[in-house]
Amino acid sequence: MTAKAKDCPSLWGFGTTKTFKIPIEHLDFKYIENCSDVKHLEKILYVLRSGEEGYYPELTEFCEKCLTNLAPKSRALRKDKPAETASSFSAEEWEKIDSDLKSWVSEIKREENTCHFHDPENHPGVEDPLPPVRGSTCCPHSGKETYSKSKTAKKRIPRDYAEWDKFDVEKECSKIDEDYKEKTVINNKAHLSKIETKIETAGLTEKEKSFLANREKGKGNEAFYSGDYEEAVMYYTRSLSALPTAIAYNNRAQAEIKLQRWSSALEDCEKALELDPGNVKALLRRATTYKHQNKLQEAVDDLRKVLQVEPDNDLAKKTLSEVERDLKNSEPVSELQTKGKRMVIEEVENSGDEGGKGSADEREDGGSDEAAMGNIQKKLMVRRSEGGRRSRRGRTPGPRAEQQGGLRETATASTGDSHYPEEPRAADNPSGLKRRGNELFRGGQFAEAAAQYSVAIAQLEPTGSANADELSILYSNRAACYLKEGNCRDCIQDCNRALELHPFSVKPLLRRAMAYETLEQYRNAYVDYKTVLQIDCGIQLASDSANRIARILTELDGSKWRERLPPIPAVPTSEPLRVWLPAAETPDQDPCPNNCMPSITDEKMFQALKEEGNQLVKDKNYKDAISKYNECLKINSKACAIYTNRALCYLKLGQFEEAKLDCEQALQIDGENVKASHRLALAQKGLENCRESGVDPSQVLLSPDSSEAARHLDTKNDTAPPSKGRERRRIQVQEVDGSSDEEPERPAEASATSAPARDGVEDGGSAEPAEKLDVSKPTNAYEFGQVLSTISARKDEEACAHLLAITAPKDLPLLLSNKLEGDTFLLLIQSLKSHLVAKDPSLVYEHLLYLSKAERFKTMLTLINKGQKEQMAQLFDGLSDTQSDGLTAEDVQALRRQYEL
């Protein structure tokens, strides 16, 4: 009975609806009340409204209420509303609607009549350009007649067999090519000639004219972007004929600038400015036309107007700088400038005032010295490359050299002014004259600056020694002006006078040395540079110049060039360094004498600076370390360790002359200093003084700890006895220091490679234990790779574990880079297993996690053998057995799966 009921549900149930196949039992009040399915209720409501199962108004209304409670915004609740008719409104409402419609229709008809039909009295001659009104008298078939006439052309007759015998293929092909080229040229010209430059706008409204103008402007923009500027000009002209606008004038001006039609572009820019006086683009493009028409002052005015509106306009800034440079170069040369010869000027010195306010005017650095050097270095290199030693005192730079003189002008100089400053007045005080001279010097007007300094000097000369410092500064500043102009002899005279007033002043010495070098008086220049280095050996310009002149003198005079030098004056140790004083001090304040005891704060500062310098040496940043050691020597100039440390930096940088000076100074303080003697020998060897290089290391051998000097002497004299046993390989040994109080710590690479490998032990001898590696934290991938390769060569698991302990795990993929090899990978695993897993399992887990993210990790897993996998498994077993906070067995198991274990 049950099976039959399932086979024939219609016998026991009521069936389903045709739409949606809903059971008939669901069309019931009780089911609809309990139903919470919105979609199903919507289907039931649709069936009830359709009436396919009968009309049940109450059930339909009940279903709507239930659906409203469940989903008030359901689309099924919406009912169709028929369009409203006149009967749907009241009489007043319908009358209002009807009047609005009638007024709209009449207004549209009136506008159509005004667009197409005009009064001949008000618009005479308008009907002529307009097409005739279409009517029965028009003949619409004129185009077809012309087409039929054009078709009556002579037909092509095939060639007969006799003509084919005389047919020349190459000749016919060349004819076809020529015809194709001619047609191509003709088509290009025809394309431009067919474009009319004027649009008939008679009878059009303003809206229609604006539409036509915008359409033609868009065509011009497309032609401009494609590079066809001629076509763009024609389309912009058509747009302007329809409706003149400032935008169209601007666009046509830009296209004409591309075609280099400066006059037409200028006219368009002026018309655009008439329509829109503050148009930025018009001003910018007019400035461009002024620039190419050599109207530089007008261009400057326009560009400044642009920058007032848009201060961040990069194009305006760039163009203004170019125009101002051209304007300055086009100025006539004054009478004062014709007295000297102009040199090539690459950049302007930071300040021409030595005694001005601020640390920038009182501190001497390499940048300002290089600026004061001018073009001397380049001239010397050219002289050496040519092999000649001819004088360059009469050379006049070209136009490009004159342009380079004004590239580095400061904001204090008014570069846009075309007039020259007025002559100095005798009534001005010396400080005002000096300040004005500094401004002129910064602006590149060296002759005018020298005139200002001369008047100030004339006012202060009668006072004598009362204003010696001020006079020294003025003479030095005027010497800088003479040096810029190439007047080296006057520069030397002023520097001599400045040094008479204030001996051992750095800037006059430097400028006199540059002038001597320009005049090719290299011995005097070398003496001045060496004097500067005695005052302050941290001036890079003096150091480089001394080394360069030493090479030149070696070429000129041979190995005995030092014997021909003038005597180098000895600088008193108590001589104050006026240019290196801090900003808070004045040149009149004397620093603390060298023999006075430093205070507690000085000792702390000295130690801090020394440690910073040692750390910089460890990081191989030798230049910054030298600056730190310079500060240390200002606090205590009797510290022998500082001189030896700085000598080491100079040796690393290849500055052997400075290293030699520091070593000699250290030996004056401590005559038995081993390191100073050894580094002095290295410096002399670097200077190729072979005779002197063999003396000091032999003296150093008296010390039992100077094994490095013994090796140096052995390599020089080549007198070491042959070793017994098998041949040992030579290892590069860098300088090793055992004293932490006197020397900076060794870099990671130096310490890693400092211990030579012992290949064998002689009979009867005992093997000495290998020196423990001093591993420091690497700062980049290169240093990490160098240290790791050294550790791998020694198979030192303890050193590798120490390296991993001081290395952040997140930095491991970056430090390894793509250098993960099989032996390196195995060494890392063994080090973690043997030394770190018991001490710090969390660190081991992090290292293993980040190691799996390194490059070539997956490749390494495919290359390791079974024994290496067992070691990895032992490491993970040890990691699982060790209890640690924050490390669960699930984490270790997930990491084990990454290692395919």
UniProtKB/Swiss-Prot annotation:
It is found in: Cytoplasm; Dynein axonemal particle. GTP binds at P756, A757, R758, D759, G760, V761, E762, D763. It comes from the Eukaryota. GO terms for cellular component: cilium; cytoplasm; cytosol; dynein axonemal particle; nucleoplasm; protein folding chaperone complex. The modification Phosphoserine is found at S351, S359, S703, S739, S740, S766. Gene3D superfamilies: Tetratricopeptide repeat domain. Pfam families: RPAP3_C, TPR_1, TPR_8. Its main location: cytoplasm. InterPro entries: CiliaryAsmbly_MitoImport (IPR051982), RPAP3-like_C (IPR025986), TPR-like_helical_dom_sf (IPR011990), TPR_rpt (IPR019734). GO terms for biological process: axonemal dynein complex assembly; single fertilization. TPR repeats lie at residues 213-246, 247-279, 280-313, 430-464, 472-505, 507-539, 606-639, 640-673. Keywords: Cytoplasm, Fertilization, GTP-binding, Hydrolase, Nucleotide-binding, Phosphoprotein, Repeat, TPR repeat. GO terms for molecular function: GTP binding; hydrolase activity. May play a role in the cytoplasmic assembly of the ciliary dynein arms. May play a role in fertilization. Binds GTP and has GTPase activity. This is Sperm-associated antigen 1. It comes from Mus musculus (Mouse). The lineage of its organism: Eukaryota, Metazoa, Chordata, Craniata, Vertebrata.
